[in-house]
Amino acid sequence: MVTVLVAALVTFTIGTSLLVGAAAVGTAAAVAALSQGLPDPTNLNALTFAQPTLVYDRTGKVQLGRFQRQQRRVVTFDEVPKLVLDATTTAEDRSFWDNGGYDPAAILAAVAGNASSSGSERGASTITQQLVRARLLPADVIAPDADRYVRKAKELIQASRLTAAYPGEAGKQRIVTAYLNEIFYGHDAYGIAAAAKIYFGVGDLSKLTIAQAALLAGLPKSPSNFDPYRYAVPDAKGRLVVPGTAPPVVRRDWILRNLSTSRWTQLSQSQLDAALAEPVILAGEQPLSFLAPHFTWQVRRQVQAILGPGASIETGGYTVITTLDWRAQQLAEKWLAAGAIAPNLKPKASAALLRSLKIGSGDRRWINALRGKDLHNGAMVALDYRTGDVLAYAGSAGYYREDLASRKFEPKYDAAGDGARQPGSAWKPIVYSSAFDTRRLTPGSLLLDIATEFGKGWAPRDADQLERGPVLVRKAIQYSLNVPAIRALQRVGSNAVADRAAKFGIRFTGGRKAFLQAGLAGAIGTVEVRPLDLTSAYGALGNGGVRVAPRMVLEIRDATGKVIYEAPKGKATAAVSPQAAFLTTDILQGNTQPKQNPIWSAALEIRNGPRGQHRPIAAKTGTANDARDLATYGYLAPPNDPKALALAVGLWMGNSDHSNPRSKKPAISLTAAAPLWHAFVRDLTASMPIATFSRPNEIGRAHV
């Protein structure tokens, strides 16, 4: 039969060089010639489909995003209801379950029709032929300039070969399943599962109604012309409804009326009438959006780096399990919106946002105090400093708040990992820990706090403009004094601190050279660093001086579910000695203790233990010149349970364009970044056990 059909095509196309030659040697020879170069039909076994890469949180349950070139979800035969199979064969290939991969009568009719008309080629393609055309023909055969009748002949031959290679019921099931996963349904929907989701919001094919299944089955014939969204109009309820006279509905109705000729489905008259009367209500176009978007984009970069440049993230069908803690992420986004967005809205809108975020009256006081302070953005990182796992990551105060976008607020830009900001006094612990590690200073050392010209015309002062004379290093750090910090850098040396910063994993904007060029000003945080890096560095202080590189990807599986990457233990680097780390920590935790630092502790102390106990935390704020950048960084004591989270949190607030806030009395870190940081850490740790910082055996204690 194949030979006869090819002969018909040969007869119609005599005149082309190929088929004139074929006619000379006979139809059988033409079939043999046309079969040359066709792929092995058993390639169906290895057929893969472009599938999106799915990104999940650390539990594998919360989908953060999907990277895709085509919207597709691959299904098995068992997932496809008989109704969908019947609607599909009714629309595309009524004899599918019995034919040899082609429909002889349809092909002969198409050839006759094309011979008697000067119009375009009539269709006669079965489901098997459509699958062959899409995936099992050489590229040159389906090229736009290829002879369409030669292509049709090769398609017919290959469809016959495919059916022979996969005989019987099982073979038909494989072929129709591949077809249903491959075929284009319009509107960026590839495969029946994606089509059900895009048009009707249905994720489980068994939930499709009879009318919905029929409409979907009718789309592949002409996805553009039959796209329901082209014809949909909103009704009084705001629903997208496709009129009954629209082409996709007319085709749906034709399929419904012919469903009873299919294999399994037999509609009663009442069922048919109900299906014909069912309005086509579309789900509405859903823009592709991510949860934790800045984090998810960073994950994409890391996955590409892990798998190599040859891996296609958009089509590879990978599943990525990340380090993200969804609860922590939600809290980070909540408090950034409350502290950086709400104060810049009009009063009614601000109050509405705070209500939706369920912000209590106590926190509303400091939030409302930020109104008019001209601070429009913020970024936050929370990580487990023992594993390097990034738990929460927000590169702006609201990725999707394009309605508020301005020079001062760029919602899409990632200020946590791509951007860099001046840390101000939050940098000082890096300088002092270097001094402790090299034994240039101890917490009991004295440094002179008096106005000094350190360079031509540069005589920095403390924020309060006071001079205290000789001060203990401990007090100089706790009260964030600038002049003693500069003297500390003098003792250690900029090169030594730059070396130490590299061990802490800190990347300066402009590189090491920028820090050295800053000279002694580098002691007070004038060189920009990434919040992600500085958060990790603070975590190293809590981890006995050992910095574990941040990571975001825990596991990658391929499209078959096989694990192809499992994150190794985080790379650990000794940044400072355990003794130096503890000395720094011991001083910084005083910032959260009222007896040691009543000013800073008012903003930073957290009392959320089981009975309201004080929670040991080491923290430091930072305010850059002119209050352009505000920061708070800190870390909790490591829990005794090695599997429990050891938390470090970093926060930046400011404006995207690096502009100084236009305010007569600008906010400082203690009134803006510190309370926001405090609220996040307070809420996140509410159910965590209390842990304390342990002193190394080599460290003694003396009163000075």
What are these regions (language model features)?
Residues 1-55, 95, 293, 343:
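N-terminal type II signal-anchor transmembrane helix
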Residues 76-128, 190-200, 208-213:
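Flexible, acidic/glycine-enriched loop-and-adjacent beta/alpha segments
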Residues 97-107, 190-193, 266-272, 427, ...:
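Short, well-structured active-site flanking segments
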Residues 113-141, 288-289, 386, 418-420, ...:
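Conserved catalytic neighborhood of penicillin-recognizing serine enzymes
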Residues 119-334, 502-503, 507-509, 515, ...:
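Non-catalytic, structured segments within soluble enzyme domains
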Residues 129-140, 181-188, 205, 210-225, ...:
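Glycine-rich, acidic and aromatic/proline-enriched surface loops and short helix-turn segments
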Residues 155, 159, 163-171, 222-251, ...:
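Active-site loop and adjoining helix of the penicillin-binding protein/serine DD-peptidase-beta-lactamase fold
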Residues 322-384, 389-395, 400-419, 427, ...:
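A penicillin-recognizing enzyme superfamily signal
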